[in-house]
Each structure stands twice: as C-alpha cells, then as structure tokens.
Amino acid sequence: MPVKDAPFLEERTAAVMESVFNDPIVKKALDQAVPQEIFTIEEQIEICEVPAPPMKEQTRAAMIAEKINSYGLESSIDPVGNVIACRKGTDPDDPVCVISAHMDNSFREGTDTTVRRQNGRLFAPGISDASRALACMLQVIRMVVNNDIKTKGTLLFIATVGQEAEGDLRGVKRIFYSSGIHVDGVLVLDGADPGRLLYGSVGSKRYKVEYSGPGGHSYLNFGQYPSATQALCRAGALLANLQVPAEPRTTFTLATLNGGSSVNAIAEHAECEIDLRSEDAQMLDGLVQEVLPLFAFGAQLENQRWNVTDPALQVRCKVTPIGHRPAAVSKPDSPVLQAARAAQMALGIKLTDFTSASTDQNVPMSLGIPSTTLGGGGREGFNHSLSEWFEPVRSYEGPQLCLLTALALVGLESGSEPLLPIYTAAPREQWQDRL
C-alpha cells in the first residue's frame, strides 16, 4: 500500500498523543534517549556478540533476562525460551500492550558475530536483525523504570524465540496459542527504519516434499524404473510456470533441492522445500490447493513415462508441512496504527513505508489483536548476510517512537484514557495453529 494511503488520524488519537507527548515526565524520558543512545549502541554490540542461532537462543535469553532484572523489572523464561517481564499498570481492568523483539538470528551455529567498526558503521552478522530491536526494547524498559512512568494499562516486554526460518514463530505462537496470557495490543520491534509501519502480515506455508522409488543402475535399468529426481524435476517445471496475482502479492519458491546418491544410479530418493506466501489468507490457501497437487502429478508423470504400473516399483510422493505463518491485514482505524502514526508525527519522523511483511506480528494480527511492527532506529543493510551492517544515524528515534506509541495505547495514570480497547478472545478453535 503506498505511503499516501496511510491512515488519517482520528481526532481522539491526536488528542491522546498531544496529552502524552506534552507530559513533563514523558518529555524528560524522550529527551534522555538522545545521550543514552551511546549506551544503547554498546549494548546492541554486546547482544550481537552473544550467539543466538536458530533454535538455540538459550545463551542470549539468559543474558537478556539478567539485563532486564538489573534494570528493575522481574523477568522469567517460559517453557519455549521466551523472556517475559511485566510493568503493571495502575488499573488491572485497563489494556495490556506487548512490546516484543526476537532473539534469534538467521545464521548457523559457529558463525563469527564479532562486531567491526568502520566509517561510522557497525559490521557483523545479526548486528541489526535482531540485535537492534533487542537493544531498543531494553532502552524502553530503562526509560519507563528510571523515570517511574506510571501507566493505566500494563506493558508486557517479551524477547521471543523462533522468529527466523525453521523457528516458525514458535515463541510468539506460544504466547498467543497456549500461554493463557491476555493481550490487547502488540508492538513488535523489528528492522531499523522508524519511518516504516506495517499494516499487514505476509502469510506463508512451507512444505517438505519427498520422492522415493526403487532406484537402479543408470545404464542397466534404464527404462525399467522411474527416477525420484526426475519426478521432482517434472513437478518443479510445472511449478515454475504457475501464474500468480500481483495483487494481493502472492509468491512461490522452490527453495531447496536434494537427491540421488551417485552419478551412475537412478535416484531412489529426492526432496525439496517449497515456500508459498501471500498477503491474503484466502489467496494463500488457494495457492496451497493449486501447488501441492503438482508434486503428486510429478510422480505420476514419471511413472507414466516409463510405463511403470506395479505400485512397488513406482515413485511415490510424500508432502509434510514444515511451517505456517498466518496472513492478516489491519484496518485503517487500528489503534496501534493510529498511535504509531501519531507518535511519528509528534517526533517529526517521516513515514517512509506503509507495507506488509512477515514478523512476530503475524500471529496476534491474525487473531484480530491490534498489532504492528516498528523499527528500532538507525539504518541497516545486507540483513541476513555476513556483510550485514548498522549505522546509528538518529537511532534514538526507535526507542522514542516505541515508548510514545505504547504510552498512548495504555494511557498515563494522570492522563487520557488508553487508545487500546480490551480484546475479546476469539473462539478457542480459531486460536489453534493449523497448517
């Protein structure tokens, strides 16, 4: 969605933001963020250099928990590894707003994440994604605690596990599918640019496809037995020619390919992983229904090519779901979008992008819980690569934006009412993680 289509601020939102922004204690906290950014950057570097490969975030989780405790909140680690800390509001009947950042990076275990400084930039795998978001969240905690900012609603800080790749959002799924924690709104910290706002969640469904057959000698058994790799190639060719809509943006990727055991053997095994995405949940489901039969058809074509009718000698296809990130779209009057946009305007932050992406917001947004994603501040480049960099240009705007947005959502003790409504949970069956 173009930036020009960003939501128009409602009068109530503007009034609440004006009240929060002009509160003397809040102004003091916002001003302090500028000189304190030096400490935040050093903490970002420290976080980056603590390993957190996919599915192995324990060391970093222990570090984040210890830091939160030292900053004046009591943290705990839940059964899947999320670090959770609560800053209770003065009114237990007022809303609960989550501020979250994921702990895992996208690099395999053993990757050197030592940070290098050069020409005003910081270089290291993971220095921006997600070290910046974690440092931003910790700075928001310090701003709230050190200035004793009292809110009507509750702020719940969560450092999540499993956001990247095979993690499949397992941390945030735990929070919203099975923890029993009540949440009314969500601010996810991810990326750097504080000018970007997310109105939508790009959904994805991922599958592992396996072919198995009898195998055989490439010369002696030629024409007698089907090939698992050739069945996969036939299916891949069908997928490559598939037509998908440009709007809502919908994509497919044959991501990985493996198969065969020797150059002189008919392959008895082949496998691949496919990634299907769309901004629209119904479009994503339709894409799944269109794509998965292609792989079964690939096996059928290979068996037909060699006229193999004996089931024991045919290539067989097996499809296994390996990931699901639900799709969702927010309405323009979503309180988190309203509050975030108002906070940007109050801070003089230009709206640079109003778009959809895949972040921890996917799960709560798909349940109807008001959610968006905010940048942690600064500039970034080459994320998910060994050349990843972060530039701390006005990076203090990230913590400022997050704090101001959150305070408008939960309300100040002595100020206006919270912008967040109390969320009424969907029927239990709608909360289940169905692939």
How would you name each of these model-derived features?
Residues 126-202, 410, 414-435:
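Acidic/histidine-rich catalytic neighborhood of metal-dependent amide-processing enzymes
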Residues 103-117, 200-211, 342, 372, ...:
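Acidic-glycine-rich active-site phosphate/pyrophosphate-binding loop
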Residues 51, 99, 117-166, 205-211, ...:
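Alpha-helical metal-binding/catalytic segments enriched in His/Glu/Asp
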Residues 100-102, 158-160, 186-190, 210-212, ...:
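Short beta-strand segments
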Residues 80-81, 91-97, 111-112, 118-119, ...:
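Short coil/turn connectors at secondary-structure junctions
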Residues 1-28, 223, 228-435:
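Metal-dependent amide/peptide-bond hydrolase catalytic core
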Residues 1-123:
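Acidic/His- and Gly-rich active-site-bordering loop/insert found
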Residues 107, 149, 198-204, 263-268, ...:
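Short glycine/proline-enriched loop/turn "hinge" motifs that connect secondary-structure elements
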